[in-house]
Amino acid sequence: MQYNIILLVDGSLSLEQANQVNEKQQQTLTNVEGLQTEYLGLKELAYPIKKQLSAHYYRWKFSGDNQSTKDFKRTANINKQVLRELIINLEREYGYLASINPKKQQLALQKRAKYDEIIARENNPENPDVPVTSGLASTQPRLSRTEKAQKPKEELWDVVQKMGNFDSVQANPYRPRFKRFNAEHVNQRQNQQNNNNNRFDRNRNRQHNRFKDKQ
């Protein structure tokens, strides 16, 4: 089975000391083949780990069985200079399995060809047979946050130029449209107020009658 291990060593150590810790941890692996070690550098952590803010990153690649990392897990948990370890079994990862599956590879190629064909037609509607120079071609450029915020305002301005601003029509009392709107609004408020008054009178009369019955 193919394994990847990410090892984080205490960042307060020097590079030589971190390499010694890395080599010591590699000796705990058993029955491994093709071990490859890559130093990824000293990086800041997103959050403190064992009160440390930085760590030396190492990546291991090797082939082994289920028992290859058993001793490594035990010693890594005991060693205080090891901040964190991550063991990845590539043969259990769906992405890795799909990358070595011939059927998945063929399906991915078919989807890619279909995608390139659609992009070619959209970019060249007059001549759809022109080959695509880049698979990442797009019909429209991506907009920034500022452009996205400005776009609704531009669309609203186009509507105002074509249809007129409804707010300005309401603000002008000399236009029939405003008078009609204002009259309808006043009638609705009067009807609602009359209904509320009638409801209040009925409730008051009902309570008054109940009080008389009790007497």
Curated annotation (Swiss-Prot):
Q: Which domain of life is it from?
A: Bacteria
> What would you give as a GO molecular function for this chain, any one?
structural constituent of ribosome
Q: Which CDD domains match?
A: bS6 (cd00473)
Q: Looking at the record, which segments are called Disordered?
A: 121-153, 187-215
User: Keyword RNA-binding: yes or no?
Assistant: yes
Q: A Pfam family name for this chain?
A: Ribosomal_S6
Q: Matching InterPro entries, A to Z? A: Ribosomal_bS6 (IPR000529), Ribosomal_bS6_CS (IPR020815), Ribosomal_bS6_sf (IPR035980), Ribosomal_S6_plastid/chlpt (IPR020814), Transl_elong_EF1B/ribsomal_bS6 (IPR014717)
Q: What does this protein do?
A: Binds together with bS18 to 16S ribosomal RNA.
What SUPFAM superfamilies does the record point to?
Ribosomal protein S6
Any one Gene Ontology cellular component term annotated for this protein: ribonucleoprotein complex
Q: Where are the transmembrane segments?
A: none
Q: What are the entry keywords?
A: Ribonucleoprotein, Ribosomal protein, RNA-binding, rRNA-binding
Read off the Gene3D superfamilies from this record.
3.30.70.60
Compositional bias (Low complexity): 188-198
Which GO biological-process labels does this protein carry?
Answer: translation
Q: What is this protein called?
A: Small ribosomal subunit protein bS6
Q: Which family does the record assign?
A: Belongs to the bacterial ribosomal protein bS6 family.
Specify whether Kinase is a keyword of the entry.
no
Q: What ranges does the record list as Basic and acidic residues composition bias? A: 144-153, 199-215
